[in-house]
Amino acid sequence: MKQIYFLLVVLISFNLKAQSKKIKIIDSISFEPVPFATIFFSNNNGIISDEDGLFELIPEQYSKKDSLFVSSMGFEPKQFSLDIFNDSIIRLVPKTISLKNVVVTNNQLSSNEIIDSVKLYIDKNYNFNITENKLFFRQEFNQELEKFKLNKFKSTIKDLTAESMDRMTDNLPKKSKNELESLSYYYVNSNIDAPKIKLIKSRRTNDDNESDLSKSLGDKLEKSLRENLKSNSYFKIRSGWLPFSGDLTFNGLWEIDSTNQDQLNKLKEEEVKRKENFSIGQKGRIQSVYLKSFFNPNSELNFILKSKNYIFSDSELTYLGNELVYVIECYPKRGDKYKGTIYVNSDDFAVVRIDYENIKPLSKFKLLGVSFSSNLEKGRMVFSKFENEKYSLSYYQNSRGNNISIKRPFKIIEKNKFVKGRKKQNQISAKLDFASSSIYNTELQVFRVRSIEETQFEEIDEKNQVLPIYLEEFKKDFWEGF
């Protein structure tokens, strides 16, 4: 399996027909990144840089004949011809005089009139057909370890002593980051609450920020478990009066006998299940993005459909790319958790962009030494015209912050039914004192939308055979050819 994986990586790295690359947008004076800048092409496709000013230029988005336009509030816009564009950094020049962008019109509408018009034209403006969406979905998880202590540690496994565990926990990386990206066809059917997905390709990238000592201790722990635990054991976990039980399985801890057909069949079944679970997970996460759309009655971004719950600022007219738009600030009157800024096309009253941010904690939980809080969520949704002059979701970006802490005793008890004597084999006990904070970033880009018939939707086979390829570092040619 390792040889096959290595061969795949080699083949990918030598395929040099058209490379994707990461580009950073910075302030030409301060050299600070320019977050959430607008990047669009002459073919009307567009993306937005992330909070670090980064975006990925993927061949699927453009042709060599296209031009690249970059703009951000407070900076002079820039334009490039893609057939000669080879830079990895774009420098935007700050505007020398920052004046309020005011457009004079003889048809000045109030914010409430604009919101009412948005409601009136929702069915006309947005694509509610059954659609096939070719999209790129990226998830980034950043975690900072604030505390990890195992107090009163006891173990019957000879190599797992309190001293060795202290060394291991002291050398855990304080910060970690991993990314998961996938390209897929995602099928939306508004008539049923069951989308479909066909995965094309996926990759996972982790930061290699662990120290050599931490790695060696990890190897020592694995070696100790392999030598002291039996592969046919099971375990029970107890935390106070809360018991749990399950099969003792550690992926890769015990070698598979290539001559044992039962083990090989079990391995194949686990592989099929992993692929199925991965596709189900990706489909559910993408579905949660689409359900966030403002025209979904159950969305928390209900600035339009539940406009009575919000206070709206006076509208301002400005340009978003080449479009003249109304900009309206939204602030909740009572219990709603989000404030927002909506951008409404002045011609057809379609919402083309929504920026949102929470103003209240999203959730809190504290019970029996376990506490969890979700205290941050901010993001952006962009809607663009694809086929039939209808708007569909084209871009989504979201950041969510969580805090978790655990202060609880626990026991892990190894038991085995296949040995003579008592079932209990080993026991580990300790009092866990753990705290961490995390930021979960999500980004979705839609490259193409096309309507399909009901019969085509029903015939879609969801037998996905894709698992993410693990890479230790970012490779710019991974998405080549896709």
Predicted regions and their residues:
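Hydrophobic beta-strand segments
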Residues: 37-40, 68, 104
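Bacterial Sec-dependent N-terminal signal peptides
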Residues: 1-24, 39, 99
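Short, ordered, surface-exposed loop/turn motifs in non-cytosolic proteins
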Residues: 21, 28-43
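Surface-exposed, low-complexity/disordered segments
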Residues: 91-297, 303-307, 321, 374-482
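A short, solvent-exposed loop/turn motif at the edges and junctions
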Residues: 69-80
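A short, amphipathic beta-strand motif
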Residues: 21-27, 53-55, 90, 102
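Short Pro-Gly-centered beta-turn/loop motif in secreted/extracellular proteins
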Residues: 56-64
